[in-house]
Amino acid sequence: MTTKNRTKKRVKNSPLTSILVVVTGETSDETAVRFACELLDEQHSKLYILYIIEVSMTLPIDAEISTSTTRGEEILDQMENISKIYKCETHAELLQSRRSGLAIVQESVDKQVDAIVLGIPYQEMYGSFSIGDIAPYILKNAPCRVFLEREPIPPKSSYNASTH
C-alpha cells in the first residue's frame, strides 16, 4: 500500500476538497505540501499555499519589504512546482500581517477550507520541545481540521548522546 493510499484511507469518510498549507521556508514545507496534496480528492480539489510576512508594529502594514517578498515568492514558486505533480488546482499567496496565527485562521475562514496543514521543524526552547506560538493558536482557533507535520528529531552528536 502506498503512502497516498494509507493517507486517503484515514480520512475516507470525510473527503477533503480544499486545504490551506502554510509555508515558511523551513525544510518541512515540501513534506507539508506533498502531504496536503495526497489528502486531497484529485477531482475538483483546491490547494491554497500561503506564505506570511510578519510586519513589525513599527512599520505600516503595507510596507514594502523587498527581501522578505522576494524570499516568499521564491518559496511559493518552489511549492507550486511540487504541487504540479498532483492533480489539484493550486493557488499561492503571499500575505503581510501583524500576527501569523490570526492571518492563517482568517484565510481558512475566508477560503472555507476543509483543513489546514502546517509543517513545523523540530525545535527546542530552553531545553524542552516546542511547537512555537503559531501552531497552538491555529489548533485552538481554526474552524476546520488541522494537521501538523513535524520534522524528525535531529540526530544527537555522539558527545551529547553519551552524556545523557
Which sequence ranges carry the predicted segments?
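Small/aliphatic-rich secondary-structure junction motif
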Residues: K8-S66, I82-K84, C88
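Glycine-rich, Arg-bearing micro-motifs that act as flexible, cationic patches
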Residues: L118-N141, P155-Y159
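Active-site phosphate/pyrophosphate- and oxyanion-stabilizing loops and adjacent acidic/basic residues
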Residues: C37, E80, V105, P136
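General small-molecule cofactor/ligand-binding pocket signal
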Residues: Y48-L50, H91-L95, F147
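Short secondary-structure boundary segments
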Residues: Y51, G119-P121, R150-E151
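A short acidic, glycine-rich active-site loop
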Residues: E64-E74
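Structural beta-alpha unit
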Residues: M1-R10, S14, I85-I116, I153-S158, ...
